[in-house]
Amino acid sequence: MAKEEIKIIAQNKKAYHDYFIEETYEAGIVLSGTEVKSIRMGKVNLKDSFARVENNEVYLYNMHISPYEKGNIFNKDPLRTRKLLLNRHEINKLIGYVTRKGYTLIPTKLYLKRGLVKVELAVARGKKLYDKREDIARRDAKRELEKHFKEKQLGI
C-alpha cells in the first residue's frame, strides 16, 4: 500500500518541553465548515489546549481556531469546546490513564489525513523543573558533540 499523505498544520512543541509523552492516539475532531477552512489556512493554536474525558466522551478545550475571514455569521467561538472522535476501547484506555495521578491528555499535532482533520492526542505526565533543566543540558551536550564531530570531519 502507498504511504498515506499527512500534512501537519500545527504542532504543540511546548508539550514536549513540559510533559513526558507516554502514548499517542489519533482522533478525529468535530468541526464546523468555517473552522475547517480556517485550519486549512493554518490559523490554529494548540499551545494551552488540553483534553478531558466527560460522560465517556473526549472533549478538547482551549484550542484556538481563528475565525474565517469570509465566514461572517457562520463563525463559531474560537475557543469553544470540541468533541474528539475515538473508539470505545481507546476511550476506556484513556480513562484508565487519566484516573492515575499526574496524567493528562494533551494534543501534540493537528494534521490533515486524506482530507480529514485529525488530532494526535498524547497521554502525558508533567515534568518537574529539574527534569526540564536535565533535558536542556542533554540537548546542549548533544549539540556540542555534533559540532565537535563536524569540525573534526571538516578538518578545522
UniProtKB/Swiss-Prot annotation:
It is found in: Cytoplasm. Gene3D superfamilies: 2.40.280.10. GO terms for biological process: trans-translation. The keyword Cytoplasm applies. Its main location: cytoplasm. GO terms for molecular function: RNA binding. Belongs to the SmpB family. This is SsrA-binding protein. It comes from Thermoanaerobacter sp. (strain X514).
